[in-house]
From Swiss-Prot:
HAMAP family tied to this protein: Arg_succ_lyase (MF_00006)
GO cellular component: cytosol
Pathway in which this enzyme or protein is active: Amino-acid biosynthesis; L-arginine biosynthesis; L-arginine from L-ornithine and carbamoyl phosphate: step 3/3
Reaction catalysed by this enzyme: 2-(N(omega)-L-arginino)succinate = fumarate + L-arginine
Top-level taxonomy: Bacteria, Pseudomonadati, Pseudomonadota, Gammaproteobacteria, Chromatiales
Compartmental location: Cytoplasm
Organism: Nitrosococcus oceani (strain ATCC 19707 / BCRC 17464 / JCM 30415 / NCIMB 11848 / C-107)
InterPro entries per UniProt: Arg_succ_lyase_C (IPR029419), Argininosuccinate_lyase (IPR009049), Fumarase/histidase_N (IPR024083), Fumarate_lyase_CS (IPR020557), Fumarate_lyase_fam (IPR000362), Fumarate_lyase_N (IPR022761), L-Aspartase-like (IPR008948)
MF GO annotations: argininosuccinate lyase activity
Family membership noted in the UniProt record: Belongs to the lyase 1 family. Argininosuccinate lyase subfamily.
Pfam families named among the record's database cross-references: ASL_C2 (PF14698), Lyase_1 (PF00206)
GO biological process per UniProt: arginine biosynthetic process via ornithine; L-arginine biosynthetic process
Name of the protein described by the UniProt record: Argininosuccinate lyase
Keywords (A to Z) from UniProt: Amino-acid biosynthesis, Arginine biosynthesis, Cytoplasm, Lyase
């Protein structure tokens, strides 16, 4: 019986006696999507080669040849001059095969002390680290746009809503600053996630570490990692960092989706609070008059993609024993699409928001409807010595009468108001104006224009501290 090695063209096929089924080869290959990790893969391989040379596993000449070969491969890929092979399965094997073809047998030494298990974990962490930085930059650009509009509209009065019903007057600047605060927390979540992403798995090898005298601290330094994974099994087994990122992305997209919903409402003829620039809208194939808010609608719709990716990754991991399993090949497409979706939606919003024009007269007119100053009247009664519950009852009856007469509270005569409570005096009309209502909420977090401007200043300081 012959014991000749039957390679079948695979780097792992020494123990196999027949080639991989053609369909299985295509079914199990990931090169169709993980090729986008080539920069990170080559960056990690160069650092690994330098570390191997430092500890004496590679000679300086071998290390230089490997690095030069990898750099030329990176150039070819970036120029579209590299052919990816399904037969070589993934980005790692494609690059390694090309390296060996170009520099000879020394290319086969690169994988010493390393497995694809810790290699892909390193690639993904490098990719996510870069992605978080790009996303954060777009997010901060959007926040800067919000601050600019909020400052311009710090005193623009609009109705505040609960249950989408008029509740109390607020300023448009105050409303926009609510979105700023939500996005600021999203920025913090991404920064916090980045700390846990920025941990080096390389050196864990397949699952148990390696017998070679590797210097993981040196590799971490070369790759800019803040920490080193301290358990080899954990390093290659978990994708919690990817799940955490996707969860942060889902929250961010949820905030964008809610904001998008308001933009759609506000830009409608029924609200007419804002006008979206034509360049961010589309028309109808049949209705000539239409100007559709497609950008915010798409952002709202794309939120479901990221939410779905979060569930996919959670489900992917929930039943896996330690250590690495082929299931984890399915982590990349949800992750890549989450990054692409976040970057696209944030860019669209960051470009669109500063270009929005407001219709202050329409906002103010809407705030005059729905008895938005009713709470101010109740507060007025409390300051006159009436308990809040009694004041609530009194004002409710006054509102009912105003509805009957199709009048605003401020349009009721003083004598009519005094019929509801004798403590009401002429000064009541000061609190029933929209401007008076807004100005009265002059405390930290309130909607008074002075407080809005102070919040904007604090917001700028927070953004500057993140730069």
């Amino acid at each position: 019986m012959s014991h000749n090695n039957v390679t079948h063209g695979k780097p792992w096929s020494g123990r196999f006696h027949e080639p991989t089924d053609t369909f299985v080869e295509e079914f199990t290959a990931s090169i169709g999507f993980d090729h986008r990790l080539y920069r990170q893969d080559i960056h990690g391989s160069i650092a690994h080669a330098r570390m191997l040379a430092k500890v004496g596993v590679l000679s300086r000449e071998e290390c230089d040849a490997i690095i030069q070969g990898l750099e030329t491969i990176a150039q070819d890929i970036s120029r579209g001059q590299f052919s990816w092979s399904v037969a070589l399965e993934d980005v790692h094997m494609n690059i390694e095969a090309a390296l060996t073809e170009r520099i000879g047998p020394v290319g086969k030494k690169l994988h010493t002390g390393r497995s694809r298990n810790d290699q892909i974990a390193t690639d993904i962490r490098l990719y996510l680290r870069d992605a978080i930085d790009l996303i954060t930059a777009q997010l901060q650009r959007l926040q800067e746009g919000l601050l600019a509009i909020a400052e311009r509209e710090a005193a623009t009065i609009m109705p505040g809503f609960t249950h989408l019903q008029t509740a109390q007057p607020v300023t448009f600047g105050h409303h926009l600053m609510a979105w700023f605060e939500m996005l600021l927390r999203d920025t913090g979540r991404l920064a916090d996630c980045r700390h846990r992403v920025n941990v080096l798995p390389l050196g864990a090898a397949a699952l148990a570490g390696t017998t070679f005298p590797i210097d993981r601290a040196y590799t971490a330094e070369l790759l800019g990692f803040d920490g080193i994974a301290e358990n080899s099994l954990d390093a290659v087994s978990d994708r919690d960092f990817a799940i955490e990122f996707t969860a942060a992305g889902a929250l961010l997209m949820t905030h964008l989706s809610r904001f998008a919903e308001e933009l759609v409402l506000w830009s409608s003829a029924q609200f007419d609070f804002i006008t979206l620039p034509d360049r961010f809208c589309t028309g109808s194939s049949i209705m000539p008059q239409k100007k559709n808010p497609d950008v915010p609608e798409l952002v709202r719709g794309k939120t479901g993609r990221v939410n779905g990716h979060l569930v996919s990754l959670l489900t992917l991991m929930k039943g896996q024993p330690l250590a690495y399993n082929k299931d984890n090949q399915e982590d990349k497409e949800p992750l890549f699409d989450t990054v692409d979706t976040l970057l696209g939606c944030l860019r669209a919003f960051a470009d669109m928001i500063p270009a929005i024009t407001t219709n202050p007269d329409k906002m103010r007119e809407a705030a005059t409807k729905g008895y938005a100053t009713a709470t101010d009247l109740a507060d007025y009664l409390v300051r006159k010595g009436v308990s809040f519950r009694d004041a609530h009852e009194i004002v409710g009856k006054a509102v009912a009468l105003a509805i009957e007469q199709s009048k605003d509270l401020a349009a009721l005569k003083l004598a009519t108001l005094q019929d509801f409570s004798p403590v009401i005096e002429e000064d009541v009309f000061d609190v029933l104006t929209l401007e008076g209502s807004v100005a009265a909420r002059n405390h930290l977090g309130g909607t008074a224009p002075a407080q809005v401007r102070a919040a904007i200043q604090r917001g700028r300081e927070k953004l500057n501290s993140l730069a």
